[in-house]
Amino acid sequence: MKKEYAHELFKIAENDWLTAEVLSKNLNIRKETTLFNVEQSVEKSLKAVLCYLQIPIPFTHDIYAIMQKFDENDLPPGGYSLHDLTPFASIRRYEEGKYILTDEEVSQALRAAKLVLDWTRKKLSQ
């Protein structure tokens, strides 16, 4: 992948985060839908950094698998705990009511993703 694509992918990640932020304020939207966009923001941010570093990007939504491509000493904020978002890009999109999410959990996820976005922005400017 071309290094320039990293910036394009990062813009999409930022938009996913903004979408999640807007969705989080609407009580008629499933929290799982909001967290899907949070997960996408994190996933695309990580993939943008890999692209920038010219490391092959795995074709997966599994944040753990994506994180394994990074040096252990250069993980994004949240590290491997970001993997907790992975189910929102897969099975949790197709289930309703098996696990009740709180507003605080959504807020925490948004904050975690924002830290990843900030980390990515710095990485792409180096």
Predicted regions mapped to residue ranges:
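Terminal alpha-helical segments
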Residues: M1-Q126
